[in-house]
Amino acid sequence: MSGSTKVLDPAFQGVGQKPGTEIWRIENFEPVPVPKSEHGKFYMGDTYIVLQTTQNKGGAYLFDIHFWIGKDTSQDEAGTAAVKTVELDAALGGRAVQYREIQGHESDKFLSYFKPCIIPLEGGVASGFKKPEEEEFETRLYTCKGKRAVHLKQVPFARSSLNHDDVFILDTKEKIYQFNGANSNIQERAKALVVIQYLKDKFHEGTSDVAIVDDGKLDTESDSGEFWVLFGGFAPIARKVASEDEIIPETTPPKLYSIADGQVESIDGDLSKSMLENNKCYLLDCGSEIFIWVGRVTQVEERKTAIQAAEDFVASENRPKATRITRVIQGYEPHSFKSNFDSWPSGSATPANEEGRGKVAALLKQQGVGLKGLSKSTPVNEDIPPLLEGGGKLEVWYIDANSKTVLSKDHVGKLYSGDCYLVLYTYHSGERKEDYFLCCWFGKNSNQEDQETAVRLASTMTNSLKGRPVQARIFEGKEPPQFVALFQHMVVLKGGLSSGYKNSMTEKGSSGETYTPESIALIQVSGTGVHNNKALQVEAVATSLNSYDCFLLQSGTSMFLWVGNHSTHEQQELAAKVAEFLKPGTTIKHAKEGTESSSFWFALGGKQNFTSKKVSSETVRDPHLFSFSFNRGKFQVEEIHNFDQDDLLTEEMHLLDTHAEVFVWVGQCVDPKEKQTAFEIGQRYINLAGSLEGLSPKVPLYKITEGNEPCFFTTYFSWDSTKATVQGNSYQKKAALLLGTHHVVEDQSSSGNQGPRQRAAALAALTSAFNSSSGRTSSPSRDRSNGSQGGPRQRAEALAALTSAFNSSPSSKSPPRRSGLTSQASQRAAAVAALSQVLTAEKKKSPDTSPSAEAKDEKAFSEVEATEEATEAKEEEEVSPAAEASAEEAKPKQDDSEVETTGVTFTYERLQAKSEKPVTGIDFKRREAYLSEVEFKTVFGMEKESFYKLPGWKQDLLKKKFNLF
């Protein structure tokens, strides 16, 4: 590069100074800032640069730069964006990860900045923008793909665009429709509901109606007829034909190339980090993604050339449009890059230190690039992490001879390094009756047989508690705060009490050094609070002392409390309590650093020098959430960026890595056999992250089941406890939360067989309801509220639909049910909902209807509704762990008539969902049933009898309104 000074583009002055998103649009080959009010709007004729700045827990800033290329943009503008991206990176210190984003093929990371989706707009700088406020509303049809990051694509508004494999959103002026292809993905259906809510709020002022249309269900819902009318009437839809844009690149084994003077040259041999030299650029071809690796001391012009070389490589190989190009800098490689290597030695696994950044800054400045704000670090203050509710029941067993032996109360908290322990903590949290935290603790000198026994017994205990406990495997020295806080005092002692430990010592020809109250022992106390109040027995020599801690020296009948010059008052108080715990009633001799007696040094074998340096804490890192898969037998993980609670899919297992702990979250709808592999999956991840990220093999590992998440897991999310209580698959959950209804999806793998007697009773009630209204007159005008035509034909169609729903073959044998509602329950629920609309419409159209006739209709419908609710409740109870767990609780019976007469009542204040003094031991789905008759009428404005005659959806709305849902 020439020696002339290169002036930083004014648009990039002061960038990356605070966390957030900054966007520029390329206009006349120059970057122009996009105001925040316009973030998320991308015009198809333009190219954009997006900078995402995040601040990690250590206080340093991290940068990701994306340049987005619209499908109608010019090649020159796209090239300008690529060059300006490199210049922006240089202004940030040359350490950003850069991504090329092609419209329609954006990375999940890019889309995660603009949840729930982006909707590319027509036009651009050159062709002129279309202002939405100047346009008349245009009906649009979209495909909605992606189970986490949503790819929304507008397609022609025509029947030929529909297929059986995708989810579609039809956005009309009056109503938004979701069309679920028969073979479409459950998670994509759920995400489409989120997009619909976004469209409704953003473009319809929150007032548009929403309708769900299921492929192949023409006759069961009135919305289906309305939907097909918009396409000119119903007709079969064609099979999906993949377009060129939908071709997904195939992942291939990684192949490394060097880049020199814009040319790529293949490098043979097994991939190794040592092959990457810091003064060169490389191309790593993974098939679906191309990585450019840039050495830390390469020049800016070399980096620009490398980007162009990668684009030329993709073009020459005729790769699909969806092929991603990502540029990474030495020392800041993301997991997706490092995972292509068998190992990634930790020498440079973490970002370069300040000295390294200074060298980069000097080099770039020499090249003429002005730098601002390379990094800003803030001091890290120790925060007390979330701990479990106090006042629970703590039980501890130690493992001995293939069985567990309970520890007496006065020994709880004394853990020996040669032994294994089971720790069960039972406590109350929120509305649930009981929560459980079950831990296996492995001493560093414990044997393999005892560890396996502990795991086996923990599994047995978990099964006896119906799968509800949060399970943890914890190794000595890696105890997390929530484990330490369980004990009033926790002291890790040398030796062991189990026969397994003693036998291993005998085999080694040693008697061991098991702690006893009479032995010489030195105990280090470094904790300052309940979350870190762990004490540790260390070698009884003077070199073990540290000026920042307190120590207890036990020698015969004497107990010294040694106080380091830099220790805290809290440590000193804790040390005194530990002394009383180990030797109750003993007299403590205080010894401040520098004033020790000769007897103190004699017990330690003589005075020696010791450290006065504070032990550095482990590196604090940001949490990362992963999904996983097996590709040709190889375990692979994929990061979920900018994650939130909604990314935890009930059909899957997920891995949360905080670097200090690893959690395996197991969804309710995961196959039971897969659930049993949770710890195996977690260990596979630890092995992988150990080789790539330097994760400790002894990191605490947890198994957490959906609905039983503890506070120390939910703290990493903006957690909404109401979401965790909704039953069903991803689609059913989202429908219940967003639409306030259970529009359930048929599960082809399960079918609910209810007896002929139940079906006959429901159909009899239905017939009674229709016969009572057969003499009514109805208006010929169309009822917009439900899209029905009225009259005998409407009733006949609804009756036929419900008959079909209830008359399933009784001879078919039902396979084991999965969690959530079964297919027949889904059909019946939809049919009953349709019936509700029919009856409501009939009453609205007949003002002269007698009160007695209306009462008959209400009674008949309530009988069907009650039968349906009882059926669904029974099915949920058979498949739901939460329902199994609550089976022991006192609760009203499922029959509404019996609920009304329950003898147990509580005040409205205590029954509310967010009560400060919540009731326990009740059925939380029927809070209202525990109100007295008087208070029920005060709250709801009606008698219980009238309330339970209402449709289920209306009951739920009222319960939500009064905080009883």
UniProtKB/Swiss-Prot annotation:
Residues 900-965 form the HP domain. The gene is VLN3. GO terms for biological process: actin filament bundle assembly; actin filament capping; actin filament severing. The modification Phosphoserine is found at residue 880. It comes from Arabidopsis thaliana (Mouse-ear cress). This is Villin-3. Binds actin and actin filament bundles in a Ca(2+)-insensitive manner, but severs actin filaments in a calcium-dependent manner, regardless of the presence or not of VLN1 (AC O81643). Acts redundantly with VLN2 (AC O81644) to generate thick actin filament bundles, to regulate directional organ growth and in sclerenchyma development. GO terms for cellular component: actin filament; cytoplasm; cytosol. It comes from the Eukaryota. It is found in: Cytoplasm, Cytoskeleton.
